[in-house]
Amino acid sequence: MASPADSCIQFTRHASDVLLNLNRLRSRDILTDVVIVVSREQFRAHKTVLMACSGLFYSIFTDQLKCNLSVINLDPEINPEGFCILLDFMYTSRLNLREGNIMAVMATAMYLQMEHVVDTCRKFIKASEAEMVSAIKPPREEFLNSRMLMPQDIMAYRGREVVENNLPLRSAPGCESRAFAPSLYSGLSTPPASYSMYSHLPVSSLLFSDEEFRDVRMPVANPFPKERALPCDSARPVPGEYSRPTLEVSPNVCHSNIYSPKETIPEEARSDMHYSVAEGLKPAAPSARNAPYFPCDKASKEEERPSSEDEIALHFEPPNAPLNRKGLVSPQSPQKSDCQPNSPTESCSSKNACILQASGSPPAKSPTDPKACNWKKYKFIVLNSLNQNAKPEGPEQAELGRLSPRAYTAPPACQPPMEPENLDLQSPTKLSASGEDSTIPQASRLNNIVNRSMTGSPRSSSESHSPLYMHPPKCTSCGSQSPQHAEMCLHTAGPTFPEEMGETQSEYSDSSCENGAFFCNECDCRFSEEASLKRHTLQTHSDKPYKCDRCQASFRYKGNLASHKTVHTGEKPYRCNICGAQFNRPANLKTHTRIHSGEKPYKCETCGARFVQVAHLRAHVLIHTGEKPYPCEICGTRFRHLQTLKSHLRIHTGEKPYHCEKCNLHFRHKSQLRLHLRQKHGAITNTKVQYRVSATDLPPELPKAC
C-alpha cells in the first residue's frame, strides 16, 4: 500500500527558477565557461545552456576536438544585436522581436540552427505583412523587375549547363546562379553585410495568381529584346526545343526545388520540367551570365559574391551535416508544435538527424488548418508586442515600410515551370485570381482589427470593402469617425463596439432616455451622459447601503461599517491578553495571537516554509518566481512587496512619519523607531516573546511600541 511519501510531487516553477538562477549567474559572471565573439563583441555564457538551445553549439561542444574551446568566434556577418537577443532568449525564454531587428534575429537563428525561433520570426513577418499586401502590392511590371526577396522565399537553385549529346558536365562559373545576397536586402536600411543568407529556404506564397504567374514563367513567344541575353546562355544553343522526356534528362540539368513551408516534397517525387523555347531565338554570347528575365546591371554584378552559407561552412560546420534540413522533422519532434525548441538529438547537426535522413524516413505533414495553432497565446504574446511597439512613422520608416513587404523576382530562365501541385498550396496567405485575399490567417485578422481600431490609420480602397474592418460609427455631435474619439468626446452616449453597447443597454435597460437626457428610475435624477447615470447608480442605489460619513466607502453589512469607522477614530477595542497590543479588528487580534502560540498554518509548497498570515505566504512565493511587480516611478527600482515600495518612496519624498514622543526625533521607517526605543529608552518592542506576565502587570513607566 503506497504511502503519501511515495507520491510524485510536481514543482511547476522549478524550470523557470533554474533558468532564472542561470541568468543571474551569467549576469554576475559565475561559472561561465565560454566566450562568444561576434564582430569584436564578447558574450560570456554557459556551454550547457548554449548546447541545449542551439544545434550549432551542440555540434561544436560534442566534438572531441572542439569541446574544450573557451573562445569561439562566430561568422563576422552575424549581427551582434541579433545574437544578444537570442542569448537573452536562451536564458529568459523571452524573445524581443521588433520590426527593426526581425531580420537580424532570423538570420542569426538560422546560423545557430534554432529552428523554432526561425519559425516564430516567419510568423511574425507574415502577420505584419498580411495587412500591407493589398495596400502596396506592386504592379505586374514591378513584379518582373523586382530584385528583393524575403529570407523565407529564397529558392535553392544552382545553375548548371544543359548536357547535350552526352558530353561531360563542364564547370561554368558564368552560369553559377546562387541567390544574390546583397540585392536581397536592397530595400532595407540595414547594410546587407549584417545578415547571413541561406539558399535552402522555401518559397511560401506568391503575390500573383497561379495563372498570372504561369504566364510569366512560360512565355510562348520570344520575351527577350534582341539586345538582351538569353537565360542560361553558357549552354550551347540547340535549334530544336529544349524539352525532353523526363527519363532522358540528366540529373545535372538546372532545375529548382520549390518547397512548401509546411511540407517537404521527396526528391524522387518531383518531375523535371523544362522550357520550350521557340526556334527563332538568337543565341547569346558565351560569356554572359545566367540571369532572370530582367537584365543585371554592372554594378550589381560587381557586388555579387557567394552566399554566406559558404562562409558559415568555414566556421564550425558539422562533419555530417544533412543536406535537406526540412526532411529531418519526425512526427514526435517538438518542432511540430509552435515555438518549441528541438532537442539536441533532433537538431539539424546531430548524428541522429543524419541517421534519420539516411534511413529515408518520410517527412511528416503538419496541420494546415490555421485553427490548429494556439491563436490565443499568439495574440497575447505577438500582437500585444506589436501594438506596444507601434510608433509614428517618419520619412525613413515610411520608405522602409514601402519596400520591406514581400516582393519577388521573376524565376530564372533556367528554372523549369512547376506544376500547380508543386506550388505553395498550403500557404496560410493566398491570393485568388483577382488579386484579393482568399484566406487570411486568423492571427493576421486579429492583427488587422486590433491595429486599425487602436491607430485609426487610413485604409486603402481595397481595404474599405473588406468585412474584416470594423467601421467605427460617426459621432452624432461633431461627426468624427476616429476610434479614440468615442473615449474622449463628451457628447458620446455609449461605447463604440456593438457588443459593449448591448451590455450597457442590458445593464441599464430600466433607465429611460429622452432627447439625450438620462433619468434614474429610482430617484428621477437627470443626467446628460449615460456614464454619469452609471456612476450615480453605483454610488446611490447599489447593494451596499451602509456608507461612511467621512469617506466614500460603502459596505453591505452594518458591522463592517462599524469596524471601518475605527480607522477614522483611532479606536482599538481589541486587546491582546499576553502582550497588551491593541487592534481595531478582531481578525487582526486573531492573527496576532499566532505570534505567541507559534502557530503557522500557511505553508509554502515549494520550500516548506510556514507563515502566520496568508499575505506573508503570498509575498514569499514571489521569491521563487522572481517576480517584482512593483516598480518605482521615479528611479525605476522594482520591489517584490507593495509595502517595500511605499517605504522606498519616502527616500524620494523625504517623509519621516514615525517620531519618538520623548525626544521628538523622526524616522523614515518603523523599524528605525523601534530600534531607537530599544537602545535609547529601554522599551520592550519584541512582542514575539511568549510573555508569562500579563499586560496589566507591566510597569507603567515602560513604554511599549506596537
Curated annotation (Swiss-Prot):
Triggers of expression: Down-regulated during maturation of dendritic cells by selective stimuli such as bacterial lipopolysaccharides (LPS), CD40LG and zymosan. Protein levels decreases upon genotoxic stress in a dose- and time-dependent way.
Effect of residue 59 to A: Abolished ubiquitination by the SCF(FBXL17) complex
Every BTB domain range: 32-99
Modified residues (Phosphoserine): 333, 343, 361, 404
GO cellular component, one term: nucleus
Residues carrying N6-acetyllysine: 379
Record localization: Nucleus
Chain segments carrying region Disordered: 317-349, 407-467
Keywords assigned by UniProt, alphabetized: Acetylation, Activator, Chromosomal rearrangement, DNA-binding, Immunity, Inflammatory response, Metal-binding, Nucleus, Phosphoprotein, Proto-oncogene, Repeat, Repressor, Transcription, Transcription regulation, Ubl conjugation, Zinc, Zinc-finger
Signal sequence annotation: none
Zinc finger (C2H2-type): 518-541, 546-568, 574-596, 602-624, 630-652, 658-681
UniProt record, GO biological process: actin cytoskeleton organization; B cell proliferation; cell morphogenesis; cell motility; cell-matrix adhesion; DNA damage response; erythrocyte development; germinal center formation
Feature: compositional bias, Polar residues: 330-349, 424-456
InterPro entries reported in the protein's UniProt record: BTB/POZ_dom (IPR000210), SKP1/BTB/POZ_sf (IPR011333), Znf_C2H2_sf (IPR036236), Znf_C2H2_type (IPR013087)
Major subcellular site: nucleus
Function according to Swiss-Prot or TrEMBL: Transcriptional repressor mainly required for germinal center (GC) formation and antibody affinity maturation which has different mechanisms of action specific to the lineage and biological functions. Forms complexes with different corepressors and histone deacetylases to repress the transcriptional expression of different subsets of target genes. Represses its target genes by binding directly to the DNA sequence 5'-TTCCTAGAA-3' (BCL6-binding site) or indirectly by repressing the transcriptional activity of transcription factors.
Subunit structure: Homodimer. Interacts (via BTB domain) with the corepressors BCOR, NCOR1 and SMRT/NCOR2; the interactions are direct. Forms preferably ternary complexes with BCOR and SMRT/NCOR2 on target gene promoters but, on enhancer elements, interacts with SMRT/NCOR2 and HDAC3 to repress proximal gene expression. Interacts with histone deacetylases HDAC2, HDAC5 and HDAC9 (via the catalytic domain). Interacts with ZBTB7 and BCL6B. Interacts with SCF(FBXO11) complex; the interaction is independent of phosphorylation and promotes ubiquitination.
Protein name, entry field: B-cell lymphoma 6 protein
